[in-house]
A protein has these predicted regions:
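Low-complexity, intrinsically disordered terminal/linker segments enriched in charged
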Residues: 155, 192-195, 203-206, 234-258, ...
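Acidic/hydrophobic-patterned starts of short beta strands in beta-sheet-rich repeat architectures
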Residues: 92-102, 146-159, 197-207
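Short solvent-exposed beta->alpha transition segments
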Residues: 115, 119-124, 166, 172, ...
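Beta-propeller blade termini
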Residues: 81-90, 137-147, 187-197, 201
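Ser/Thr-rich, Proline-interspersed low-complexity disordered segments
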Residues: 9-67, 241-244
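Exposed beta-sheet edge and beta->alpha loop/turn motif
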Residues: 190, 205-221, 304-363
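Core segments of small alpha/beta cavity-forming domains
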Residues: 89, 95, 107, 138-139, ...
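Structural motif
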Residues: 107-113, 163-169, 211-218
Length: 363
């Protein structure tokens, strides 16, 4: 046993004393490095745009004074004492001209208008065959503005004659002279209004229709001329309360729509006949006009009559507020009207829709 052990030792020891190879040295890979990103991305800010304010135009006081003095001297030389003067750009050249009205002596006197552009004198003349010319009375109703939205400034001269006749003359610079663009005369006056919400004024010529009523002919600019586009009845005076005439079938129909336009729904309901009122209670009937903004009636004519019953036709424009949009609808309406102890009353109607549009800029 001992021998075996020694042999084992002898055998083992040389092995233990043999030289060992050097260990391989491993160079550790370097740890990766990162450049930290900014928490918020940055960019070169765009320069804030700056604007150079346009200087406000200034008037040369000396030039203005000289212009006024020259104008006064020219008027004095012409022997004219103006009723009023305006200083406006009437020909679109960027410079103002003098616009004035004065009264020419005569029987009766005649209203006259002129434009003084530097040394150039322009008379604004009515048609030769006009009975009243620009007017018979001293007035100072004068406007310079783009009345029909055509991009040009028109000169509007208002006048009056006899008891209630209203006159309107519209002039325009045509490149060489001031031409008469349009002329209107109504025995109950003339007025401007944007009737259809298109930002261009229509011309309403008013005529007496009797019984506190006027009939209006509405004229609209078509790009070249004014033309008749609509007619309607309205009150001569705006004072309330109004008397609803029912002495004729036509008056009953007119009164009904004027009451609706006045928002006098009880008054309008009272113009319905007994059968109509029996068919629909007042509260329920009035609810049907909850969205109505305005109503206009024109072209009213009695077609025929048989005993105490008449047939009346009319055209009606109704304006309704539908979800914040004003919608205009044109109707043909035919009414059956019956004579009662209290006058003519509306019994039943048939309607036919002719047109519908949105009044985008309803006044």
């Amino acid at each position: 046993m001992r021998y075996l052990v020694l042999v084992s030792i002898v055998v083992v020891l040389p092995t233990a004393c043999a030289p060992q190879p050097a260990p391989t040295v491993v160079t550790p890979a370097p740890s990766p490095t990162f450049t930290p990103l900014p928490a918020v991305p940055t960019s070169t800010p765009a320069p804030v745009p700056t604007t150079t304010p346009t200087p406000a135009p200034t008037l040369d006081s000396a030039a203005v004074a000289a212009n006024i003095a020259a104008g006064e001297a020219r008027l004095e030389a012409q022997g004219i004492k103006p009723l009023c003067l305006r200083w406006d750009d009437t020909d679109g050249d960027g410079e103002a001209e003098w616009v004035g009205l004065y009264l020419q002596p005569g029987e009766p006197p005649q209203l006259a208008a002129f434009i003084l552009d530097g040394d150039a004198w322009h008379d604004l003349r009515p048609l030769e065959d006009e009975k009243y010319g620009l007017g018979e009375y001293p007035t100072c109703e004068l406007q310079v503005r783009d009345v029909n939205a055509d991009g040009r400034a028109e000169i509007l001269v208002w006048g009056h004659a006899e008891a209630s006749i209203g006159l309107l003359h519209i002039f325009i610079w045509d490149g060489e002279s001031y031409a008469l663009l349009a002329f209107f005369e109504g025995d109950a006056g003339v007025r401007l209004e944007d009737a259809d919400g298109d930002l261009a004024d229509e011309i309403s010529v008013r005529y007496e229709a009797g019984d506190d009523l006027v009939w209006e002919a509405v004229h609209t600019w078509d790009g070249a001329n004014y033309g008749w586009t609509w007619e309607r009845y309205t009150w001569f005076y705006l004072d309330r309360p109004h008397v609803y005439r029912t002495d004729t079938p036509e008056h009953a129909v007119i009164s009904f729509y004027l009451a609706v336009d006045d928002r006098d729904l009880p008054g309008a309901y009272g113009l319905l006949g007994p059968e109509s009122q029996a068919a629909t209670p007042a509260d329920e009937w009035m609810t049907g006009f909850a969205t109505t903004v305005a109503a206009e009636v024109g072209a009213v004519h009695e077609l025929g009559r048989s005993g105490d019953t008449a047939t009346v036709i009319a055209q009606v424009r109704a304006y309704d507020n539908l979800d914040g949009r004003v919608i205009a609808t044109l109707w043909d309406v035919e009414w059956t009207v019956a004579l009662t102890a209290g006058g003519w009353r509306l019994e039943s109607a048939t309607t036919d829709e002719l047109d519908r549009w949105e009044a985008v800029y309803y006044p």
